């Protein structure tokens, strides 16, 4: 019995090798090309391709998961958040989370006139 682990990381980041019951599963790699020869019942993985703190979308989604999933659901169904039933739900969700406009302003999410698109004239 063995395990096959597929990693989408760059090849220079490490090699994943599995060895169980005296059989070596190298996924087409010759045994002399393997970097590691683990002991019995060992699975080694050297690198990680996913780092949650560096993913701002996921870190924000984990703060308010129900609001995030509701927004995703509304976006997938192309619902208008300004219509009455959804507008009430969004208002209640924002009030329940305790987020104020001042906190949003302090985070720098406010759009300034300098950052907004400017109108240009082409002759």
Swiss-Prot record:
Keywords of this entry: Chloroplast, Plastid, Transit peptide
Cellular location(s): Plastid, Chloroplast, Plastoglobule
Keyword set includes Chloroplast: yes
A GO cellular component entry from the record: plastoglobule
Give the region (Disordered) as residue ranges. Answer: 97-123
Q: Where is the composition biased (Acidic residues)?
A: 100-123
- The organism's superkingdom is given as Eukaryota
Primary location: plastid
Q: Where is the transit peptide?
A: 1-26
PANTHER family, alphabetized: OS04G0528100 PROTEIN, OSJNBA0038O10.25 PROTEIN
The family assignment reads: Belongs to the UPF0426 family.
> What's this protein's name?
UPF0426 protein At1g28150, chloroplastic
């Amino acid at each position: 019995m063995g395990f096959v682990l597929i990693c989408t990381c760059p090849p220079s980041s490490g090699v994943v090798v599995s060895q169980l019951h005296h059989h070596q599963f190298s996924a087409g790699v010759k045994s002399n090309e393997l970097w590691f020869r683990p002991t019995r019942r060992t699975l080694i993985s050297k690198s990680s391709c996913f780092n949650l703190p560096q993913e701002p979308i996921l870190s924000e989604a984990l703060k308010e998961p129900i609001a995030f999933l509701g927004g995703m659901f509304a976006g997938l169904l192309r619902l208008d958040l300004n219509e009455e039933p959804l507008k009430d739900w969004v208002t209640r969700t924002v009030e329940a989370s305790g987020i104020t406009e001042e906190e949003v302003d302090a985070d720098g999410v406010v759009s300034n006139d300098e950052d907004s698109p400017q109108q240009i004239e082409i002759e």
